[in-house]
A protein has these predicted regions:
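Glycosyltransferase-associated regions of secretory-pathway enzymes
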Residues: 1-65, 81-178
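Small-residue hinge/turn detector
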Residues: 67-78
């Protein structure tokens, strides 16, 4: 079962905009019994590898969070949301999955709109492995929908935007996360 933890990233030490504050407030409203964890430069080692170091030094915080979200959910389990994701209901029904992901369109899965997993989940590990060519910091950055979807395709995902169940988790159509 996925633990009742919500992870999010906020790197750069800047003040959160109104939208982020509103979205985080919605998590607290609909998930009062969840632990909410902000990952930032104080509790995540920016020097984990050359990729994380490069992203941070070049203020590519969105790309940094694409990678960090996978590591923290893999290590700790829980749900991840970008700070522009507003909840309109409690997500407890998703916790029974080993992992859950959502399509953003018929071809791509997007972990930023929300995903969750038990710690050490196979699919999340596969997503982390997709970053291996980038960890030296010499190959630039790439958006997470492409990398994350490629990882799930290797595990049997069909790119058609449909509801799909696997031994490692469930992928939901975009309607669940829009």
């Amino acid at each position: 079962m996925i633990p009742k933890k919500i992870h999010y990233c906020w790197f750069g030490r800047g003040e959160k905009p109104k939208l982020a504050k509103k979205c985080i407030a919605s998590w607290k409203k609909y998930c009062p019994d969840y632990e909410i964890i902000e990952w930032n430069e104080d509790n995540f080692d920016i020097n984990t590898n050359e990729y994380t170091k490069w992203c941070y030094e070049n203020k590519k915080y969105a790309f940094l969070s694409d990678y960090v979200r996978l590591l923290v959910v893999y290590r700790h389990g829980g749900i991840y949301f970008d700070t522009d994701v507003e909840l309109i209901r409690n997500p407890d029904f998703l916790l029974e999955n080993q992992a859950f992901f959502g399509f953003e369109c018929s071809e791509y899965v997007n972990t930023g709109v929300g995903f969750g997993a038990e710690s050490e989940n196979t699919a999340v590990n596969q997503m982390i492995d997709e970053y291996l060519p980038f960890l030296d910091g010499k190959n630039g950055v790439i958006g997470c929908p492409k990398l994350n979807t490629e990882a799930l395709v290797k595990l049997g995902l069909i790119r058609d935007g449909s509801y799909q169940e696997f031994p490692w988790g469930t992928v939901y159509p975009k309607e669940y996360f829009n």
